[in-house]
């Protein structure tokens, strides 16, 4: 499927190294209206057929390499490590991909599936806007109509990405209901898909939603861990000790973790949006205060109010501001294979500024949450520890938001 110049093996989508979690025992499922059962069955059938098809595999490989810009580098950040009294720290540079984040890995694959199915239109939700930008770019490249649903709150704080989506030829639909955030954008996209599924593909941006989406997104994002597993050998003769990634829906994290899941010596850490602190009630830390429930067609941990309805969520990072989390993360949380924690807005902002000033790399606010956890644990780690943080996206999209925040603080 995907052959990177530095990797010793191909990304074979018919081989699932995380097979323990392929058929999820507790979470996942397909909780959808009857109108969507057949379209989802068709999607699963098409994907299972295509991932074994030589032409599809070659096309996907060509686009990943020559359009998306894979492989992405593994960068050791010595200045950052010294500043936090830390161990050997590396960044997996998904921020250097075309469109600025890991999202492009998944949308290219899903758009190719949609074209094989004869569909001419793709729709999606987006929070931070990175998924919307990636899908708009992929749709333009592959000659498809594209509609992006985005909560009004996120449109206001992610204007640069909204402008990029429109420049790329896609339509942006503002969703003005409820919390006007990512959950509401997903609701609107699903409604569109229900009525137009005959010619439309719903391109979910994270490893969640009804089956088979979690499987498909995980497989397309697993190119991240495939590359890391090979690239770290340039620096050491062993696997890393710890992997850290931010977790909104969880696609960058599950792709980053995937090829390391069988090696239980590698510690896997997902970092959620802690907002103003869990005690404040204004956060998106699903594993900290959420409980199992069903939302958007799948079963996982969900932030709920006392009546069992979806609670309002909050994070300075639009990409982490979601009420639930991918079902594979729920399984790994309960099995203990991965640890999940959170970082607050202030901690993420501190990490954002520190990496920018010490390494000349501006991280996305989403990725800054993972960096914040790295800062928090760094002094407690042995100096020969090898830690890798997935830099899932770049922070250009967040600059105006952060500058405005700084101005308000100065005048308060």
UniProtKB/Swiss-Prot annotation:
The keyword Hydrolase does not apply. Pathway: Amino-acid biosynthesis; L-tryptophan biosynthesis; L-tryptophan from chorismate: step 5/5. Its cofactor is pyridoxal 5'-phosphate. It is an enzyme of class 4 (lyase). It comes from the Bacteria. One of its GO terms (cellular component) is cytoplasm. Gene3D superfamilies: 3.40.50.1100. Disulfide bonds: none annotated. Tetramer of two alpha and two beta chains. Belongs to the TrpB family. NCBIfam families: trpB (TIGR00263). This is Tryptophan synthase beta chain 1. The gene is trpB1.
